[in-house]
Amino acid sequence: VTLTSTLALMATSLMAEQIKVGVSPGEHAEIMEEVARVAEPMGLEIDVIEFSDYVVPNQALADGDIEANSFQHVPYLEAQMKDRGFALAVVGNTITTPMGVYSDKITDIANLEEGATFGIPNDPTNGGRALLVLQQLGMIKVDPEAGLVPTVLDIIENPKDLSFKELDAAQLPRSLADLDAALINTNYAIASGLSPKEDSIAMESADNPYVNVIAVQKGNEDAPWVKTLLEAYHSDEIKAFIDESYHGTVI
């Protein structure tokens, strides 16, 4: 029986499809590593490739250096495809990670002083998202004509005269000492040792349009490995891993 099992495993390994999946640090990387473990017995070997920013994973996918990526929400992907001409496609949803407000100086956003400086991501989609979170929290009001991608120029009400410093999203956790507060994506918060549940002073509503997705090159949507990847990601094992690991900060 042991020999038979060993031979079966060897045969499965030889037949396994191999793909590279690009992720960003934090929960996207951690979850995909677990997905890789679940997918292996299903005949899919996943090499998880971690990228340090939000730009390279789509470029790598468009160039064919990886087969899929899992790090972004639909508004960001759509903006990237429009701005850079990438021919990519969404094949499935993954997680939602509400953006948080973090500060080394205050513990309650109501105590934010007039003229305070907020750090926000410098890419249009996540920068716009950050401004919409501040609007949700009653700190500012933006022009509704701007939709999901307002800029600081679209702020029409700013009663506390807040100023904004636009930085690369990955740099925001390291820049908290130089800011009064910052809007930080959950993956970069977790990667820097911040707990969204314990360390944030305010959180984006979970009811938001920023569900994250798995993207592939256009034309690969029906590749057999895509179905296996999605089955592994949406398995009960991964759901349990997310619930146990993130305690409601990743949905």
Model-derived segments and spans:
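Short helix-initiation/N-cap motifs at beta->coil->alpha
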Residues: 48-59, 146-174
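Beta->alpha turn/N-cap motifs
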Residues: 26, 50-54, 64, 69-78, ...
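A conserved helix-loop-strand patch within extracytoplasmic ligand-binding domains
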Residues: 91-141, 239
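Periplasmic-binding protein-like
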Residues: 93-102, 190-234, 251
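Pocket-flanking alpha-helical
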Residues: 54-85, 100-102, 107, 127, ...
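Ligand-binding "clamshell"
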Residues: 79-91, 104-106, 178, 183, ...
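Ligand-binding clefts/hinges and TM-proximal coupling segments of bilobed small-molecule sensing domains
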Residues: 124-140, 144-150, 230-251
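Short, well-ordered beta-strand elements
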Residues: 17-26, 44-50, 117-118
